[in-house]
């Protein structure tokens, strides 16, 4: 059941609709890790209609984005284990742009997979760096019978840690219900109408 909250209908206009659109997408996929450009183009058709939908208590835009987000998250969830199943090439120089605000959504599933590969490589490298530092410290402090783990072992442990972190992340995401995602609309920094799912 949907209940209409108290809000000033005059404040809902195309400008507010555009703000809600951008803020909502930022809150559910701000790092542009799930949606594709084709999704964004489809969502953009609603950019100036959200105000009307809120007034009419029409959840078409929310339903579309919610279902697509779940689909895209499932696609990525099935991808990360494969990307972490083999060692990364840390000799290859690559860059990873973390200025998500300026980025576009990935053009295709292939470009999204490449983005995830780089993100997972960066995460694994960070864990690996910590493991190497820890090993070097143990070498300095230990007795002669301490045997340092090899690079291969440390790299595999780092990938395992990254995989476990991803498993925890997706477990958390999978525990969220539809209403939790719907609440994302209401918790933006904007003054939105109160629309409750009961």
Annotated model-derived regions:
Residues 1-6, 162-172:
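Short amphipathic alpha-helical segments and their helix-coil junctions
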Residues 1-143:
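Cationic-aromatic interfacial patches
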Residues 7-12, 150, 154, 173-177:
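Short acidic, glycine/proline-enriched loop segments that cap or flank alpha-helices
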Residues 16-17, 21-24, 65, 69-72, ...:
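Stable alpha-helical elements in mature extracytoplasmic
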Residues 139-152, 156:
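Long, low-complexity, polar/charged, intrinsically disordered or flexibly structured peripheral segments
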Residues 188-194:
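Conserved small/polar residues in nucleotide/adenosyl-binding loops
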């Amino acid at each position: 059941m949907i209940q209409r909250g108290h809000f000033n209908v005059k404040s809902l206009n195309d400008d507010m609709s555009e703000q809600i659109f951008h803020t909502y997408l930022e809150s559910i996929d701000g790092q542009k890790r799930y949606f594709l450009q084709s999704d964004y183009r489809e969502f953009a058709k609603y950019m100036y209609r959200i105000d009307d939908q809120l007034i009419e208590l029409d959840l078409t835009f929310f339903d579309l984005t919610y279902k697509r987000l779940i689909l895209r998250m499932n696609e990525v969830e099935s991808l990360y284990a494969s990307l972490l199943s083999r060692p990364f090439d840390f000799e290859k120089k690559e860059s990873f742009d973390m200025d998500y605000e300026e980025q576009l959504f990935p053009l295709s599933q292939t470009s999204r997979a490449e983005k995830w590969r780089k993100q997972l490589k960066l995460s694994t490298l960070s864990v690996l760096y910590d493991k190497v530092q820890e090993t070097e410290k143990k070498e300095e402090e230990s007795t002669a019978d301490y045997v340092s783990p090899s690079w291969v072992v440390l790299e595999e442990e780092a990938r395992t840690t990254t995989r476990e972190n991803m498993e925890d992340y997706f477990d958390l995401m999978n525990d969220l219900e539809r209403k939790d995602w719907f609440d994302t609309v209401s918790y933006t920094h904007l003054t939105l109408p109160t629309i409750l799912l009961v």
